[in-house]
Amino acid sequence: LGDVYKRQVVNYLKYTLNITGHQLDEILNKKSGLLGVSGVSSDKRDVEAAAAAGNPRAQLASDMLNYQIKKTIGSYIAAMGGVDAIVFTGGIGEHDADSRAKICHHMDWLGIRVDTDKNANAHKQNKDVVEITAWGAKVRTLVIETNEELMIARDTKEVPVSYTHLTLPTN
């Protein structure tokens, strides 16, 4: 949906269901998405486990998320006029080889192709950056380890701090 339609849907739901903004936020951000479709969880790992056990709603939720990620990648590639690399990071990006494969499937025409063995074994490499690009692909595909603690430390270091408002004890 376009942004205009999203606002209309939000307003329609709020007034039709006669709920507060807080209640609508709870529905849209906590009870929808993976949880709403799968009926299992908002955690992709739980959804994947349920899908592997044969839960069709969990499989649908996983497929929908992978499709949405693929669609987003495609829209960014179009907006930027091409890319040099696709980077997978974070929980799903780093640890879910199956999702990476499904997301990149049928993207050869964009120059994106993943090596099946490299992708399946990316987590075993013990490297910060693992390339999973298939031979001959024009766009590099990388799995990059997330170091959230380091990023928080770097961001915190950049925050200007003023101590003029502090009164320190003089014991």
Predicted regions and their residues:
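A conserved active-site cap/scaffold subdomain adjacent to cofactor or substrate pockets
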Residues: D3-E26
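Conserved small/polar residues in nucleotide/adenosyl-binding loops
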Residues: L1-Q8, T164-P169
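Adenine-nucleotide phosphate-binding core of ATP-dependent small-molecule kinases
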Residues: E26, G33-V37, K44-A79
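Short glycine-rich phosphate-binding loop at a beta-alpha junction
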Residues: V83-G91
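Buried hydrophobic packing segments
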Residues: V9-L13, V47, I73, A153-T156
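Glycine-rich beta-alpha junction loops
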Residues: D3, S32, I92
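Flexible, glycine/charged-enriched surface loops at secondary-structure junctions
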Residues: G21-D25, V37-S42, Y76-D84, V114-A120
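Internal helix-turn-beta structural module
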Residues: Q59, D63-A79, G93-S162
